[in-house]
Regions:
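N-terminal membrane topogenesis motif
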Residues: 1-24, 67, 75, 139, ...
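Alpha-helical transmembrane segments of multi-pass membrane transport and lipid-handling proteins
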Residues: 19, 56-59, 82-109, 113-114, ...
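Membrane-proximal transmembrane or re-entrant/amphipathic helices at the cytosolic face
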Residues: 405, 424-464
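Interhelical loop/hinge segments that connect adjacent transmembrane helices in multipass membrane
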Residues: 1-3, 113, 139, 163, ...
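Helix-loop junctions and terminal segments of transmembrane helices
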Residues: 58-74, 248, 252-288, 341-346
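Hydrophobic alpha-helical transmembrane segments
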Residues: 144-191, 358-363, 377-398, 438-443
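Transmembrane helical elements of multi-pass membrane transporters/channels
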Residues: 10-25, 148, 170-185, 189, ...
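Signature of the first transmembrane helix
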Residues: 3-63, 92-96, 118, 149-153, ...
């Protein structure tokens, strides 16, 4: 099977699982915004925001090492899984130790043990599901994802609509669904069988920790870029403002979801390709069409966002639509940064990954600290946008030191300017549809050749 077909096949498999999963999550937002106040929704999201940070710290990001070393072929995969589970046990102990300290944060003190159980279950989830990829069980991976989300949605309906449990119901839904799917993946994914024949290798343990440990700072930096603004909005503005900001961030998540579907397949493909060949044309083509897709999707979503949000969210969250356009542009540059992050992973340049993300995180913290006290939610939006732009451009430049990925700079910059101006105009409610039409026409004219190639390839694929 050619590498393009293999990449497409893996992407489609992950798409089945991810689209089903994310569609359910997307449809749950109206439920949350109608059965929870903006303050409750903000509190719940704050807990999950902190959980993301703790997962990276307590796990030493070992789940990334599981897939990297499991796919490399130089190690026995069951031994790789054993290292993952050893780290998981340590994370349980360390997590229980620091949870009372985390509970000193007043907003989440009531929910600290809910946070703990969600974090440890999420670490196990990431280890198990990455290992399913190592085993080539991508179909099971997709099916289990859909099942977990379906259970989460069902629990949410029960706890929020029938029991009116608010934040408690929201947290219980995620904890119970993650716990059940962890057990299912362990049994039906036959991970128990893999562990039964595993042997501890000290050298492998050290190598995996050496690979994953620098990723802690990288992931923490990503957390700062992606989520620290939520904590700062809660502290500097209000929990209700955080709820509105969270609702606004759900729409850009659609682009992030689509990219993550591709990214899961791309991570596997680039690791395999980097160890056998280093043809820049392949990487350049993939990047070109990834940017074409994400920027095009951004234009479409920004155009319809005002009308869509009117029907999508509860009335208490009505102002959220204004923040979405610039967050959508942020999602485009996040996709660019993630693409180059995969190249770092394949090249085992985790230190570069860490430092480029750390730079953007520092930029984000400074801008948030300066702007949020005066501009509220807008300060967080601007900080997020600038941080993603910084990390995207820095990585594009840095990766060229190790491999050549051809990028048409004129086209890339032109499209970037178009989507940025379009987003600003829509956020300001300035001649939305006239500006949108001009932006789309400019986008099509710039990408006419590449769009034509895509149409021809798609037509051939359909006619087969």
């Amino acid at each position: 099977m050619s590498r393009y077909k293999s990449l497409l096949k893996d992407t489609l498999i992950f798409a089945i699982g991810s689209i089903g999963t994310k569609l359910i999550l997307f449809l749950m937002v109206p439920l949350y915004t109608n059965y929870m106040t903006s303050a409750e929704y903000g509190t719940a999201d704050l807990i999950f925001t902190i959980a993301q940070l703790l997962v990276s710290i307590l796990s030493v990001v070992i789940f990334d090492a599981v897939i990297r070393f499991g796919l490399s072929g130089g190690e026995k995969r069951e031994n790789v899984l054993l290292v993952g589970f050893i780290v998981f046990v340590f994370s349980i102990i360390l997590g229980a130790t620091i949870t009372p300290i985390i509970g000193l944060y007043k907003t989440i003190s009531e929910w600290k043990w809910y946070l703990y159980f969600y974090v440890v279950l999420s670490i196990l989830y990431s280890i198990e599901f990455n290992y399913l990829k190592v085993m080539g069980k991508n179909k099971q991976y997709a099916a289990f994802n859909i099942l977990q989300t379906g259970m989460m949605a069902s629990f949410n309906v029960y706890f929020l609509v029938n029991k009116f449990l608010g934040v408690q119901g929201y947290l219980l839904a995620y904890i119970l669904s993650t716990f059940i799917i962890d057990i299912i993946a362990f049994i039906y994914g036959k991970l128990w069988k893999e562990l039964s024949k595993a042997k501890f290798e000290k050298a492998l343990f050290c190598n995996m920790i050496s690979f994953s440990a620098p990723l802690i700072l990288n992931n923490v930096s990503w957390w700062i870029i992606h989520s620290s603004d939520k904590v700062m909005v809660e502290i500097m503005v209000s929990t209700a403002a955080l709820g509105i900001y969270t609702a606004a961030a759900k729409i850009p998540a659609l682009i992030n979801v689509t990219v993550s579907i591709f990214q899961q397949a791309w991570d596997i493909s680039v690791i395999k390709e980097i160890e056998t060949t280093n043809e820049s044309d392949y990487y350049s083509d993939v990047f070109k069409y990834l940017f074409l897709f994400t920027s095009g999707a951004c234009l479409v979503f920004v155009t319809i966002i005002k009308v869509f949000m009117h029907y999508y969210i509860g009335i208490e969250f009505a102002d959220a639509w204004r923040y979405v356009p610039l967050l959508l542009v942020s999602a485009v540059f996040s996709a660019v940064a993630s693409y180059y992050g995969s190249m770092y992973g394949a090249l085992k340049k985790s230190v570069n990954n860490m430092f480029t993300t750390l730079l953007a995180a520092a930029v984000n913290i400074v801008i948030n600290g300066l702007l949020i006290p005066f501009m509220g939610i807008w300060g967080a939006v601007i900080g997020t946008l600038i941080a993603y732009i910084v990390v995207a451009f820095v990585r594009m430049i840095d990766v060229r030191r190790y491999m050549m990925i051809s990028v048409n700079c004129k086209t890339f910059l032109s499209i970037s300017v178009i989507i940025l101006i379009h987003a600003i105009a829509v956020s300001l409610d300035f001649h939305i549809y006239a500006i949108s039409l001009l932006a789309i026409l400019a986008f099509v004219s710039i990408n006419l050749h590449d769009l034509g190639i895509l149409v021809k390839k798609f037509s051939k694929f359909i006619l087969r």
